[in-house]
């Protein structure tokens, strides 16, 4: 029996390797291993909770310099006195808002998810992006199509 999904995953993993993007390659290889082993029973949990777990891990990585003391409190306080830092704060708020709209849109219009996923994988593999794209992309789409 021919497994088209496995072939697509292998192609995307190859794209990750060709573009020297180990994040994509490793992620897809892990999914392939899960798919072809008894671990595939965990897919419903991964589909439901994977995004939340990923955001938690990403947030830990972003907050680690504050927690470790590498980013001292004085630097954090000074960020409110520099126009570039204030702009960064504003952009962070905007992008978080877009991500929230994106989560809502992905839940209400799941047919858009496939396009968002393909676009994100291509962006990560070909342009060295990071896979936070689907949420923000869905948020941007929500602005175009008027859904919140």
Curated annotation (Swiss-Prot):
The chain crosses the membrane at residues 14-34, 51-71, 86-106, 121-141. Keywords: Cell membrane, Membrane, Transmembrane, Transmembrane helix. It is a multi-pass membrane protein. Its main location: membrane. One of its GO terms (cellular component) is plasma membrane. It is found in: Cell membrane. Pfam families: DUF441. It comes from the Bacteria. Belongs to the UPF0756 family. PANTHER family: UPF0756 MEMBRANE PROTEIN YEAL. HAMAP family: UPF0756. This is UPF0756 membrane protein KPN78578_11500.
